[in-house]
């Protein structure tokens, strides 16, 4: 049985479980699929085109290398695929998240075909996930007098990959969904017993809420009722995301309530919105930032106090809580990202300034922390190559400083990386 037939068998098996075809990361399988695409009479050609466009894992998988190189051959007219014209081939490359796609784009940008070079230039200006080897290729081309490379580096020095992105929405309408009462652990969102399925995002997504199908269906029903709003997952009277720092917890939340990162990348969602009466666990909040999401300290319950200002205790000696405002499932609220306030209609509920610091808003705008980290490095690199000062685009990081006290080696490294150094005068 060839690799494609095995894949079809796997698809049939997954369909019985209510799963879609697994994203392709095997280069050998994708090569077989490409052969079927180039064969105009192949009975599997239509499905093969759909698999190629919509169901290949991005990044540095062997399939991503095969996909990027085939797109390059389409652009160079070695193959004429009517369903994938040149413009669309460039668009697909732009969604592949670095690695082999960037290598192909640089090949085209510094190549001899000016039309292709200009198209590759426009795509590269929007990319941030470049390896050092990619940056060195642009540097070498620039020093050799390549104008396209110069244009790309000038764009990077201005951080246009960030400044040309749309600002985050000023007002975001959310509908609440209480995932649980009390602290919610990452194990509730991504059980450790299901660790074996984490690489299969769709399959792993089915374990959210510890496989509670009724709760999952309630969430789906809520989304269907409010298609124009974003679901905010809430830990009522508790903290969201306590326990281990597993990224799969946030990935599962994003898969269920986040937005699609790309129409050409299957089962990768970003920007989930989560809230907790007592806020978000710091480690979990970091992983929310990685996805460009929003974490909100709701403060919707407070300790009841007596006339002296002391907490009122129940029969068990625990503080009695009073509800400040309701976030019961189905409650529609508005997040004002400019005023940094949570509203119920016109009623101000809570100050959420901590959720919208300048740095956090950058993560949201860029689609996650990695894009900002890579972007800063790219801007610094380009400005040094061009021997120009990098304009202040990103919020300045805070340097570590302790009066009368030395710095640890880690603190010194942090401070050095926190600054975009200006050229020497």
Question: What residue spans do the PLM features occupy?
Answer:
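Alpha-solenoid helical repeat architecture
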Residues: 37-41, 74-81, 93-94, 108-113, ...
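Fe-S-dependent hydro-lyases/dehydratases of central metabolism
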Residues: 95, 107-110, 114-425
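N-terminal alpha-helical segment
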Residues: 7, 29, 85-86, 101-102, ...
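Amphipathic alpha-helical packing elements
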Residues: 2-39, 360-364, 369-373
């Amino acid at each position: 049985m060839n690799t494609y037939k095995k894949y079809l068998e796997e698809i049939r098996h997954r369909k019985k479980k209510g799963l879609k075809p697994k994203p392709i990361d095997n280069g050998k399988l994708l090569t077989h699929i490409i052969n079927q695409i180039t064969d105009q009479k192949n009975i599997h050609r239509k499905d093969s085109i759909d698999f190629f466009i919509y169901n290949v894992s991005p990044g540095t998988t062997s399939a991503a290398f095969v996909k990027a190189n085939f797109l390059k051959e389409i652009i160079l007219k070695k193959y004429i695929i009517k369903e994938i014209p040149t413009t669309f081939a460039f668009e697909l490359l732009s969604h592949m998240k670095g690695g082999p796609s960037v290598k192909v784009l640089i090949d085209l940008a510094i190549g001899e075909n000016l039309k292709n070079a200009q198209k590759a230039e426009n795509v590269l200006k929007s990319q941030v996930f470049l390896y050092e080897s990619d940056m060195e290729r642009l540097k070498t081309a620039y020093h050799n007098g390549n104008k396209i490379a110069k244009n790309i580096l000038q764009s990077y020095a201005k951080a246009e990959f960030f400044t040309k992105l749309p600002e985050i929405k000023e007002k975001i309408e959310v509908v609440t969904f209480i995932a649980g009462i009390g602290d919610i652990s990452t194990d509730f969102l991504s059980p450790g017993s299901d660790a074996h399925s984490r690489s299969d995002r769709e399959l792993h997504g089915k374990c959210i809420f510890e496989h509670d199908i009724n709760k999952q269906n309630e969430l789906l029903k809520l989304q269907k009722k409010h298609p124009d709003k974003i679901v905010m997952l809430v830990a009522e009277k508790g903290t969201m995301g306590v326990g281990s720092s597993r990224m799969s917890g946030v990935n599962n939340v994003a898969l269920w309530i986040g937005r699609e990162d790309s129409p050409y990348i299957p089962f990768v969602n970003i920007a989930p919105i989560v809230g907790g009466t007592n806020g978000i666990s710091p480690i979990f909040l970091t992983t929310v930032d990685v996805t460009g999401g929003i974490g909100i300290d709701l403060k919707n319950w407070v300790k009841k106090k007596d006339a002296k200002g002391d907490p009122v205790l129940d029969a068990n000696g625990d503080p009695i809580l009073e509800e400040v405002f309701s976030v019961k499932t189905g409650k529609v609220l508005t997040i004002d990202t400019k005023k940094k306030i949570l509203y119920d209609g016109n009623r101000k509920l809570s100050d959420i300034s901590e959720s919208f610091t300048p740095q956090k808003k950058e993560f949201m705008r860029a689609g996650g922390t990695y894009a900002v980290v890579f972007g800063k490095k790219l801007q610094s690199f380009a400005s040094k190559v061009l021997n120009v000062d990098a304009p202040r685009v990103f919020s300045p990081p805070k340097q570590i400083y302790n009066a009368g006290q030395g710095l640890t080696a880690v603190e010194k490294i942090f401070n050095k990386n926190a600054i975009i150094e200006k050229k020497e005068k």
